[in-house]
A protein has these predicted regions:
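Membrane-interface "cap" regions at the ends of multi-pass membrane proteins
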Residues: 1-49, 53-58, 71-76, 85-88, ...
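Transmembrane helix-loop boundary segments of multi-pass membrane transporters
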Residues: 50-56, 60, 111, 121-128, ...
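Loop-to-transmembrane helix boundary motifs in multi-pass membrane proteins
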Residues: 23, 28, 152-160, 253-274, ...
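Extracellular loop-to-transmembrane helix junctions
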Residues: 44-148, 266-276, 445-453
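Membrane-interface loop-to-helix entry segments
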Residues: 127, 154-205, 263, 382-395, ...
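Membrane-helix boundary/coupling elements in multi-pass transport proteins
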Residues: 45, 87, 110-128, 234, ...
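Helix-loop-helix junctions that connect adjacent transmembrane segments
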Residues: 17-22, 61, 138-159, 183-314, ...
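C-terminal membrane-solvent junction of multi-pass transporters and transport-like membrane proteins
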Residues: 151-155, 166, 347-359, 393-442, ...
Length: 469
C-alpha cells in the first residue's frame, strides 16, 4: 500500500520542465489579448442579465466584485506558478510540481472537462445569436437544424460548424489564431464602448431599488440558490478563461515576465468592464426584465437604439468566437502536456512539422466538442464548468504555499505579495463559491472524477514518464 501511495504522490521536479518544442512567438500584448479574448464573452453578454433577473437583482454588481476578487487571488497565484514552474498545462503542470502525480492527474482531468464543456456551451450560445442574425437578414435556418434533439430539433448545426471552423484555424498555427483573436477582441471592446457611451446618458437609478431583492444567500424550495453570493457563483463563469494564458507559457517569448503580466492585465481590464456594464445595464431596465438571451442588445432596443442593438449582436458573435478559440487552445495544450508526461497516450504528443501545433489533439477534441455542441443542450453543458474551474483554482492557491515550503530555493521572478495571505484568501473564497453551487453539479462532478481515477489506475500510472525513470 505504501509503495502505491508513494507512486501516486511522486512529483515532477521543476528542473524537469523540458525545453519547449512549441513555437515561441507570443508577446505580453498577445497574452493579454488572449486573456481578454477568453474572458469577455458569455458573461458580459448573457450572464449579467440572467444573474440580475434570477439571482441578485441590481446587486449583481456586488456578485461580480466578489467573483472578481476570488479570481484575482487565484490569478496572482497562477502568475507566481507560471513564472516559477513553467511548462504548458496550466494548473495541471503546477499541481505536478507541488502536490504529486495523482493530484496533477485529477486537475488535468478536471480541466479537460472544464475547457471542453465550456467550448461546447459557448458554441450553443454563439449559434443562437448567429441564427438570430440570419433571421434578421431574411435567411432563417430551419428549427430542426438549430436545436439539439432534447429541444425538439435534429442537430444544432451552427454550433457544430463553428467548432470545426476553429479547429481548422488552430491547425494552421497559434500565431494566426492570435491575429484572429486580436481582431475579434477589438470588435467586442468597440461594442462594449458603444454600450457604455449610450447607456451612461440613459440611466434611471430608480431601477436600482430594491438593490438586493434576494438578499445575500438563500435556497428556494426547488433547490435553486439565490442572493448576491449565489449570483457570484453564477457570474464566476464570466471570468473563466484568464487561466488559459498560463497554458501558453511554452509559446511565450519571455514566459517568466510576460505570462504573469498577461494574466493580471487581462483580469484587471475585464473586471472593471464587467462592473461598469452590470451597473449600467441594471439602471436601464427593471432587473426582472433582463432574463433574456441577449440582455445588453435587448436593453438597447428598449431604450430606442435599434442600430446599437444590431451592433451589439455582431459584437456578441465576435466575442463568443474568441472565447471558444482561446478555451479550445487551452484544452489542446493541457492534453498535449499530459500526453508528453505519459499520462495520456503518447500519440497525442505529436506536433505538425510545419505549424508546430498538436494537430492530432486539435482534430480529436474538435470533432468530439462539435458532436457535444450539436446534440446536447446549453444548460446541461454549462452546469459542470464552474465547479471544475473552482476546484482547479483551490489547488493552484494551495500549490503556491506548498511549493514555497517544499522548494524555497527556486527562483521566483514574480511572487504573490503579502506572504501566504492572498493564496489563503484565494483558496477560501474559491472553496466558498463551490459551496454555493447546487447539489446536482457536485454529483456530476463526482462521477467525472471517479471515471478519471479509473483511467489513471488502469493506464496512466504505468505509462507515466516518472514511472519509467
Amino acid at each position: 500500500m505504501q509503495p502505491l501511495i508513494k507512486t501516486t504522490l511522486r512529483t515532477k521536479r521543476v528542473a524537469q520542465q523540458q525545453d519547449s518544442e512549441l513555437k515561441q512567438c507570443l508577446s505580453a500584448t498577445d497574452l493579454t489579448l488572449l486573456g481578454i479574448g477568453a474572458i469577455i464573452g458569455t458573461g458580459i453578454f448573457v450572464l449579467t442579465g440572467h444573474a440580475a433577473a434570477h439571482q441578485a437583482g441590481p446587486a449583481v454588481t456586488l456578485s461580480f466584485i466578489f467573483a472578481g476578487l476570488a479570481c484575482a487571488f487565484a490569478a496572482l497565484c497562477y502568475a507566481e506558478l507560471a513564472a516559477t514552474v513553467g511548462g504548458c498545462g496550466s494548473a495541471y503542470g503546477y499541481s505536478y510540481a507541488a502536490f504529486g502525480e495523482i493530484i496533477a492527474w485529477i486537475v488535468g482531468w478536471d480541466l479537460i472537462l472544464e475547457y471542453g464543456m465550456s467550448v461546447a456551451a459557448v458554441a450553443n450560445g454563439w449559434a443562437g445569436y448567429f441564427s438570430n442574425a440570419l433571421s434578421a437578414l431574411g435567411h432563417p435556418l430551419p428549427d430542426m437544424l438549430t436545436h439539439a434533439p432534447a429541444k425538439g430539433g435534429m442537430v444544432n448545426l451552427p454550433a457544430a460548424l463553428i467548432i470545426l471552423a476553429l479547429m481548422l484555424m488552430l491547425i494552421v498555427g497559434v500565431k494566426a489564431s492570435a491575429r484572429l483573436n486580436a481582431g475579434m477582441v477589438f470588435i467586442k471592446v468597440l461594442t462594449i464602448t458603444v454600450f457604455i457611451a449610450l447607456a451612461s446618458g440613459n440611466m434611471d437609478i430608480s431601477h436600482w431599488s430594491p438593490f438586493m431583492p434576494y438578499g445575500w444567500f438563500d435556497t428556494m424550495p426547488d433547490g435553486k440558490t439565490v442572493g448576491v453570493l449565489a449570483g457570484a457563483s453564477v457570474v464566476f463563469f464570466a471570468y473563466i478563461g484568464f487561466d488559459a494564458v498560463s497554458t501558453a507559457v511554452e509559446e511565450a517569448r519571455n514566459p517568466q515576465r510576460d505570462v504573469p503580466r498577461g494574466i493580471i492585465y487581462s483580469l484587471i481590464f475585464c473586471t472593471v468592464i464587467y462592473i461598469v456594464v452590470a451597473a449600467l445595464l441594471t439602471s436601464l431596465l427593471p432587473y426582472h426584465e433582463l432574463g433574456v438571451d441577449s440582455p445588453v442588445a435587448y436593453a438597447m432596443q428598449k431604450i430606442g437604439f435599434n442600430w446599437a442593438a444590431a451592433l451589439i449582436s455582431t459584437g456578441v458573435i465576435a466575442g463568443l468566437t474568441t472565447v471558444m478559440l482561446v478555451l479550445y487552445y487551452g484544452l489542446t495544450r493541457i492534453i498535449y502536456a499530459m500526453s508528453r508526461d505519459g499520462l495520456l497516450p503518447h500519440s497525442l504528443h505529436h506536433l505538425n512539422k510545419q505549424t508546430q501545433s498538436p494537430v492530432r489533439v486539435i482534430t480529436i477534441t474538435g470533432v468530439l466538442m462539435a458532436v457535444m455542441a450539436g446534440f446536447i443542450p446549453l444548460d446541461e453543458l454549462a452546469e459542470l464548468v464552474n465547479i471544475g474551474t473552482l476546484a482547479a483554482f483551490v489547488l493552484v492557491c494551495g500549490g503556491v504555499m506548498l511549493l514555497r515550503h517544499r522548494a524555497p530555493q527556486l527562483p521566483r521572478p514574480f511572487v504573490v505579495p503579502y506572504g501566504s495571505l492572498i493564496p489563503t484568501l484565494g483558496l477560501l473564497s474559491c472553496a466558498a463559491l463551490m459551496i454555493f453551487l447546487p447539489a446536482i453539479a457536485w454529483m456530476r462532478f463526482g462521477v467525472w472524477l471517479i471515471l478519471g481515477l479509473v483511467v489513471y489506475f488502469i493506464y496512466s500510472i504505468r505509462h507515466s514518464k516518472l514511472n519509467q525513470e
